């Protein structure tokens, strides 16, 4: 009797990626890892042995902090001791210790020979019929990963032994197909690395520009300026430049929703993590207040140019701000753990959002933060800080526009990076069931 398709074991094929599916597509063979590889262990060395230069080494912690499917080179070194284990090239390494069972079942290939393999590393050397990178992907993904995670033992520290890895069964296509899969993920990883570097470069450029485009402590002009602007900048106490009478609310996350409502709420957690220096009300996502209308918030509705300060955080990001722009017909209020600063005089859109997130301003807040586990700022203390700004609104606008363009590029590369990571995740889920 023929089984119903829904009850048949899924065939491990990659037709959708490499070739049209057909009856002749070879199925994948199931093998115990103990039958296809030689197992050994790394020897000695810990992070206390690391030094600036010496013999290159891989410690098990690298697989958690700097994971790569294929390790071509390393930037950690030790002074060589007798009895060390060196890579020959092609070894698959799996950490023998970790903090969680989920994290411990990961594997990398050591491509380069001559690298010391430290203690707490399981070393798996597959026979010639099996591709090392494919084996690493198999251990790190799908059913094999889940099964190995279930074998990890321990509480505060979990352990995975070579015997555990040897006992696992996994499915393998032909060597040629293994290599194709390995090459596919290599290309995806290369693209991810490329966009990660571009993203990090732009983040560093922005950080540098924030430092150089605003006057440092004690200076009246910034390090770099746009051509044609030479006048000293204005300096004012914050409560001279801004009005602090716009109230916030104390609504919790439980009183907000993402679906519907008539009034939107700026939550301090979103200021700290989600929003940039400029909050575009028409284009950024703001939660709605459940079951309330604007009549409930008379005198509290925000305007373009309002600065929202997050007055509480777990670290020195306390005091991060966002400037409200493009509000149009939306009704928005400031939420829990925020302060509203409304400029007394019109300024260029975005200027104060960027300025008050720069070290030029934020350094004033650091000695004012109070608390141990949670840091907070009082309105009284914040009002005593000073702000600096060019008299000419054209210069203000050029500064804001420059930084917004950098932010746009950062967002673009971040989205590309996320898209590639999602593509990789999808491929792993489809290839390693």
Which residue stretches match the model-derived regions?
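Short amphipathic coiled-coil heptad-repeat segments
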Residues: 1-27, 197-234, 415-433
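Sequence-specific dsDNA recognition surfaces
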Residues: 34-46, 61-91, 239-255, 271-306
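Short, ligand-facing micro-motifs at secondary-structure edges
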Residues: 64-75, 92-118, 133-137, 146-150, ...
């Amino acid at each position: 009797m023929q089984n119903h398709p829904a009850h048949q074991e899924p065939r491990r094929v990659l037709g959708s990626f490499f070739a049209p599916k057909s009856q002749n597509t070879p199925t994948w063979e199931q093998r115990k890892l103990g039958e296809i590889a030689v197992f050994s262990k790394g020897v000695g060395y810990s992070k206390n042995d690391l030094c600036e230069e010496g013999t290159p080494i891989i410690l098990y912690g690298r697989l958690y902090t700097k994971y790569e499917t294929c390790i071509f080179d390393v930037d950690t070194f030790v002074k060589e001791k007798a009895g060390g284990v060196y890579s020959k090239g092609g070894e698959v390494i799996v950490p023998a210790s970790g903090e969680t069972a989920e994290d411990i079942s990961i594997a990398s290939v050591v491509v380069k020979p001559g690298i010391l393999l430290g203690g707490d590393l399981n070393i798996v050397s597959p026979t010639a019929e099996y591709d090392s990178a494919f084996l690493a992907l198999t251990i790190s993904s799908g059913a094999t990963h889940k099964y190995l995670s279930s074998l990890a033992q321990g509480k505060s520290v979990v352990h995975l032994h070579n015997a555990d890895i040897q006992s696992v069964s996994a499915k393998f296509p032909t060597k040629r197909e293994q290599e194709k899969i390995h090459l596919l993920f290599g290309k995806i990883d290369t693209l991810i690395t490329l966009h990660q570097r571009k993203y990090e470069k732009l983040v560093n450029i922005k950080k540098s520009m924030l430092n150089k485009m605003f006057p440092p402590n004690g200076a009246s002009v910034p390090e770099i300026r746009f051509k044609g602007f030479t006048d000293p900048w204005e300096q004012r106490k914050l409560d001279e430049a801004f009005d602090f009478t716009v109230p916030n609310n104390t609504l919790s996350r439980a009183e907000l929703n993402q679906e519907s409502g008539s009034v939107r709420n700026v939550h301090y957690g979103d200021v700290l993590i989600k929003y940039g220096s400029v909050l575009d009300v028409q284009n950024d996502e703001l939660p709605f207040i459940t079951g309330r209308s604007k009549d409930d918030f008379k005198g509290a509705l925000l305007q373009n140019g309002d600065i929202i300060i997050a007055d509480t955080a777990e670290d020195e990001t306390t005091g991060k701000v966002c400037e409200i722009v493009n509000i149009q017909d939306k009704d928005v209020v400031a939420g829990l753990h925020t302060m509203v600063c409304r400029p007394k005089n019109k300024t260029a859109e975005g200027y104060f959002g960027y300025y008050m997130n720069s070290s030029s301003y934020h350094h004033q807040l650091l000695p004012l933060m109070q608390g141990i586990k949670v840091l907070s700022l009082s309105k009284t203390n914040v009002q005593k800080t000073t702000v600096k700004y060019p008299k000419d609104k054209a210069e203000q606008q050029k500064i804001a526009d420059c930084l917004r363009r950098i932010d746009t590029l950062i967002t673009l590369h971040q989205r590309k990076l996320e898209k590639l990571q999602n593509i990789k995740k999808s491929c792993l889920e489809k290839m390693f069931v």
